[in-house]
Amino acid sequence: MLMVISPAKTLDYRTPPVTARHTLPRYLDHAAELMVRLRELTPQAIAELMSLSDKLAGLNAARYAEWTPDFTPANAKQALLAFKGDVYTGLDAEDFDEADFDFAQAHLRMLSGLYGVLRPLDLMQPYRLEMGTKLANARGKDLYAFWGERISLWLNEALAEQGDDILLNLASNEYFSAVRRPLLRGRVIDTEFRDLKNDQYKIVSFYAKQARGRMARYVIKERLRDPEGLKDFDERGYRFSISHSTPERLVFLRDRPMD
């Protein structure tokens, strides 16, 4: 079973990584191609394109200028440990042991606007480039056009490497839209986490993001390979709802938030 999650806007390059092991992104040449385009933008153009404050636009202009394809532990950090945000709070990889990282490296992928697809231990230099950004490039008007079929083909390679055909989608719609489902050589299982609000079960973004990260952690810690085991997920008060679910979409409900 292969999982995909979204990246995060918040990054942490101050905390020392809990493992020294690292790999290099497989698709750095494509990231370098995008970086050439990003370096053409002024801070003002970045602010307008990405709806950022002047301060954040300046920060990211500096990141683009400093970016180099020669990744080392001195100028980059493992992606799973560099990303911080609701999904990664739920995933909580800071307490992973080496066996956990081994399983995650084989069974988890992070979708990225700049890097396309990242493995957990892939070194990553800081950036800001959401998949939905309408950055015109040589392949089209946005990043969906830039990545085209490639992300789907790379996920197929990862599925083939582990001898499986199940892709567990724990990513947001923005990011999974970069995956062309008809090209996948496997079965996609979507997930939904709903909280009780005003007498109805609804998706609450903050909680849903944390739950997606928590499920990724659950799969890694339990070494799950069979999707049937996902139905036993009951962390943070969620429970599987057979009446709300289908074989292709697993729905989990919760009556009240839990710490």
UniProtKB/Swiss-Prot annotation:
GO terms under biological process: response to hydroperoxide
Protein name: UPF0246 protein Avin_11220
NCBIfam families for this protein: PRK02101.1-1, PRK02101.1-3
Pfam families: H2O2_YaaD
Organism field: Azotobacter vinelandii (strain DJ / ATCC BAA-1303)
Cellular component GO terms, alphabetical: cytosol
Family note: Belongs to the UPF0246 family.
HAMAP family reported for this sequence: UPF0246 (MF_00652)
